[in-house]
């Protein structure tokens, strides 16, 4: 049995007893009923995920999956493909956006080479980079599949490996990514999974003008038409129109769900990874916390498909890397604090309101 198959056997829905116990406590906290709104709903989710009314979210990690894309050759990004490896060095050096925001959230940042088109063995040997490389960038989805099905499995299992390794030290993990051109495969994944049109799903990514946006839309339509991904098969979608880092994110989510670890999902590309994970195993949805809503127009459709009513933040983010996940972690900490640190009316002898 493969690592993926074994891991899927370990994924279960949230624990209903823990959810009920958390709700009973929250219903009686010293404040007007449900006065802290969505954070209280999140507190119930944390209890259900970790199977306790005293969840822990103090040991935090952001995992930035990196990979290159053959479709970048079609001009779907304002940035050249070599920026992927340059940004990998920046994140490892601690100077990127995700580093700044992760420090503010008390989170450690890990960078994973899923498929960067460069030899990064020196960074791996220095233990600055986690090596799960599947290939030197994907195929050009405008001309053929991104990867073979076997490579898709390797990408997902690479993410599972990372989740399992981090599960011994961390109790909450955020997703992130780096890969020039990766909003294009993400849009293709979103269109296939949600059934929305490519026009509804596709945005300007790194800042495309109107003509460039139309070219991007045409390329995504072409990639779906040529590759014909099976909308019911997550691995087929990943293989046909996905990316190595997107597969890594899917695997990270699957691995965290198996270990009962909450996953803070970052932006558009991370949510594409969540779509793949949910196609492979729908129960992973029970372990997702949606950090924010991206400027990318398709993000709302992707989140709604995954059952997200409203993400924690809506700040016009469109960077990725794990920046939104880092920003949201303090809100997750607040949700946990409401459940574990506030008193009930009975505990401090405060008169409860009339029912």
Curated annotation (Swiss-Prot):
It is an enzyme of class 2 (transferase). Keywords: Cobalamin biosynthesis, Glycosyltransferase, Transferase. Pathway: Nucleoside biosynthesis; alpha-ribazole biosynthesis; alpha-ribazole from 5,6-dimethylbenzimidazole: step 1/2. It catalyses: 5,6-dimethylbenzimidazole + nicotinate beta-D-ribonucleotide = alpha-ribazole 5'-phosphate + nicotinate + H(+). GO terms for molecular function: nicotinate-nucleotide-dimethylbenzimidazole phosphoribosyltransferase activity. Gene3D superfamilies: 1.10.1610.10, 3.40.50.10210. CDD domains: DMB-PRT_CobT. Its EC number is 2.4.2.21. It holds the Pfam family DBI_PRT. GO terms for biological process: cobalamin biosynthetic process. The active site is at 321 (proton acceptor). InterPro entries: Nict_dMeBzImd_PRibTrfase, Nict_dMeBzImd_PRibTrfase_bact, Nict_dMeBzImd_PRibTrfase_N, Nict_dMeBzImd_PRibTrfase_sf. It comes from the Bacteria. Belongs to the CobT family. Catalyzes the synthesis of alpha-ribazole-5'-phosphate from nicotinate mononucleotide (NAMN) and 5,6-dimethylbenzimidazole (DMB). This is Nicotinate-nucleotide--dimethylbenzimidazole phosphoribosyltransferase. It comes from Desulfotalea psychrophila (strain LSv54 / DSM 12343).
């Amino acid at each position: 049995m493969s690592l993926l198959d074994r891991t899927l056997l370990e994924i279960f829905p949230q624990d209903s007893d823990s959810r009920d116990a958390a709700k009973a406590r929250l219903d009686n906290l010293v404040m007007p009923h449900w006065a802290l709104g969505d954070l209280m709903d999140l507190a119930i989710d944390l209890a259900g995920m970790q199977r306790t009314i005293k969840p822990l979210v103090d040991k935090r990690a952001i995992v930035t999956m990196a990979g290159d894309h053959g479709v970048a050759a079609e001009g779907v990004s304002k940035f050249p493909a070599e920026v992927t490896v340059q940004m990998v060095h920046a994140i490892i050096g601690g100077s990127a956006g995700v580093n700044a925001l992760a420090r503010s959230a008390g989170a450690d940042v890990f960078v994973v080479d899923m498929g960067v088109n460069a030899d990064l063995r020196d960074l791996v040997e220095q233990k600055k980079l986690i090596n799960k490389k599947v290939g030197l960038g994907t195929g050009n989805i405008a001309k053929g599949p991104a990867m073979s099905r076997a490579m898709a499995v390797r990408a997902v299992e690479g993410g599972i490996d990372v989740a399992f390794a981090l599960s011994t030290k961390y109790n909450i993990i955020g997703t992130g990514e780096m890969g020039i051109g990766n909003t294009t495969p993400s849009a293709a994944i979103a269109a296939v999974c949600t059934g929305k049109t490519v026009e509804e799903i596709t945005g300007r990514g790194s800042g495309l003008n109107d003509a460039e946006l139309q070219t991007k839309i045409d390329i995504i339509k072409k990639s779906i038409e040529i590759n014909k991904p099976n909308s019911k098969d997550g691995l087929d979608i990943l293989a046909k129109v996905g990316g190595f880092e997107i597969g890594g994110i899917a695997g990270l989510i699957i691995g965290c769900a198996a270990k009962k670890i909450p996953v803070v999902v970052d932006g558009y590309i991370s949510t594409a990874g969540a779509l793949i994970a949910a196609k492979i195993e729908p129960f992973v949805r029970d372990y997702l916390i949606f950090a924010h809503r991206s400027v990318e127009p398709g993000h709302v459709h992707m989140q709604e498909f995954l059952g997200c009513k409203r993400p924690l933040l809506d700040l016009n983010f469109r960077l990725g890397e794990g920046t939104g996940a880092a920003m949201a972690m303090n809100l997750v900490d607040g949700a946990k604090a409401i459940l574990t640190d506030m008193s009930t009316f009975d505990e401090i002898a405060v008169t409860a309101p009339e029912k």
